[in-house]
């Protein structure tokens, strides 16, 4: 029996925000923590990465920003605020407030043992398992989450919009697997 209380481990949080103004590509290119190349994506974006960031922030000339690679919502939002601060301090954008929004939380769960996905996939409504195409079983969650379940007992949860939704989805996944005979 799989323990439904097994906590998921967050591996990536994607969040976005908008500066609600255009960003100066020339000034952004001069920033030491920014990677900007006009040849990449037609010069429409640059990347801000500082030593304190777990991931990086993509900054579009339109002012939209995407934070990827953080392992918590707080860190992801912090990356967006830090990127905004660097843009303002270097004159690439005017001072403004941002309102970060979580778009996706990706986490892993380890069941601690093998899961017989070949046997239980037929007992799980909506499960997709085709070992010739992909070695894992794909499931849709109750909320916006999707699951990948591998025979090794490793699982991936993607699509959560909050830590609470992630915990509910993890509990739901493990309960459904138990009910199917895992």
Curated annotation (Swiss-Prot):
Q: Name one Pfam family in it.
A: TBP
One GO term of the biological process aspect: DNA-templated transcription initiation
Q: Which GO terms describe its molecular function?
A: DNA binding; DNA-binding transcription factor activity
Q: Which SUPFAM superfamilies match?
A: TATA-box binding protein-like
Gene3D superfamilies listed in its UniProt record: TATA-Binding Protein (3.30.310.10)
Which controlled-vocabulary keywords does the entry list? Answer: DNA-binding, Repeat, Transcription, Transcription regulation
HAMAP family with a match to the protein in the record: TATA_bind_prot_arch (MF_00408)
Please describe what this protein does: General factor that plays a role in the activation of archaeal genes transcribed by RNA polymerase. Binds specifically to the TATA box promoter element which lies close to the position of transcription initiation.
UniProt-recorded name of the protein: TATA-box-binding protein
Please give the organism: Cenarchaeum symbiosum (strain A)
Gene that encodes it: tbp
